[in-house]
Every structure is written in C-alpha cells, then in structure tokens.
Regions:
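Single conserved hydrophobic/aromatic residue that forms the stacking wall/gate
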Residues: 1-13
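Hydrophobic (often cysteine-bearing) scaffold residues that line and stabilize catalytic clefts
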Residues: 5, 36, 56, 60, ...
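Short secondary-structure boundary/capping segments
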Residues: 7-10, 43-47
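A short acidic-Thr-Gly-centered motif at the start of a beta-strand
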Residues: 14-26, 191
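Short hydrophobic beta-strand that contains or immediately precedes a catalytic carboxylate
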Residues: 27-31
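Short active-site loop/helix that positions an aromatic residue
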Residues: 33-45
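Short, polar/flexible loop-turn hinges at active-site or ligand-entry regions and domain interfaces
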Residues: 47-53, 71-75
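Conserved catalytic core of nucleic-acid polymerases
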Residues: 65-191
Length: 191
C-alpha cells in the first residue's frame, strides 16, 4: 500500500509525467466515482439516491432537480454546483450558515435547500440520526470493514465540542469505508 521509495510516497499528479518506469511497472491513476456519496447512499439505504446511481444519472444534477423542483435538463450550472455542495456538505454536517458561506445562497435559502434535500433523500436524515445515537451509546463508530473510530467527546456538555464529534460520527464511517475500499482495491491490483 505504499511505495518503497520514500520520495515517491506522496507523488503529485503533475509530477507523474516526469517519472520514468521500467518495463515491469506502470503508474496508475484510478478514482471511484463519487465513492463517498455511494457509500452513504448504501449505508443509509437511501433508495432515491441508489436509484439515481443505478440509472447512471449525474447525482448532482439529479439532486438539483429534486431540491429546486425542476427538470434535470433545465438545471443551470450554478444550481448543479449548489447541489454538489449540498451533496458533499451533508457528509460533513453542513449547516444553513455553512452552505450560505460556500455559495451565493442566503442563510434562509440554504435552510430551504437543506430541508428539501432531506425530503428528497429521507434515508440520509435517519442514517445521520442513527449514527449519532450509536456513537453516543457506544463511544465509537465502525467502517464497513469494522475499523473503529472512537469519539470521546460525543457526549460533551460543550456544544461546540459535541457538535464536532457528531459530525465525525457521520463522516468518519463514510470516509473510513472509502479508504477501506480503495486500499482493498490497491491490494487486489497488486495480486
């Protein structure tokens, strides 16, 4: 899972073109398309999102269509961009304030969009609540392969500290599961 050459461990994309490889090796760049969104859709059993992925839809355009209530073909670039920000922001616990600071939306518009998002993908809200409750009861969460992330501050009386742990309760299993999948793929490529 790592290079045997220290300097190549953190190879930047722009530097790959300047690396010479012998005939027995290749440099490979691979990416799982929207892996974190696919993972949260699966873990949450969010059927609307799963169906969009299974139908080969662009998830950001599909989300924009749902939250703005317009046909996919009429989605503007700005609306798709806002939906993309919401899609990824949900994983990181974005608030109306956070969304408004990342987009041209007002805080009120951001709240309306986040509410519409959860109406479009109701399984996600349920999943998020279950993750936080599980962490509060057990003090940890797990990735799909059982790696644990302990959250010692999940029951903190300090709302700021507790809020950070609650966001970790949602995103750590998703990011950790993505890492699990990618590392397994790296091992399998090497076989």
């Amino acid at each position: 899972l790592h290079s045997s050459h220290r300097r190549q461990r953190q190879m930047c994309i722009r530097d790959r073109a300047f690396r010479a490889v012998d005939n027995n090796h290749v440099i490979l760049a691979a990416d799982y398309s929207q892996i974190e969104l696919r993972i949260i859709a699966s873990l949450a059993n969010e059927l609307n999102m799963i169906n969009a992925f299974n139908n080969g839809e662009d998830i950001h355009s599909s989300t924009a269509s749902k939250i703005f209530g317009i046909a996919v073909e009429k989605i503007s670039k700005e609306q798709r961009s806002q939906a993309k920000t919401v899609n990824f922001g949900i994983i990181y616990g974005v608030s109306a304030f956070g969304l408004s600071s990342q987009t041209s939306l007002t805080r009120k518009e951001s709240k309306i969009i986040i509410d519409a998002y959860y109406e479009s993908y109701p399984g996600l809200k349920n999943f998020i609540n279950k993750q936080i409750n599980f962490a509060r009861e057990n003090g940890y969460l797990e990735t799909i392969l059982g790696r644990r992330r302990y959250l010692r501050d999940i029951n903190s009386r300090n709302s700021i500290v507790r809020g950070a742990s609650e966001r970790n309760a949602v995103n750590a299993p998703i990011q950790g599961s993505a890492a699990d999948i990618i590392k397994l793929a790296m091992i399998n490529i090497n076989k």
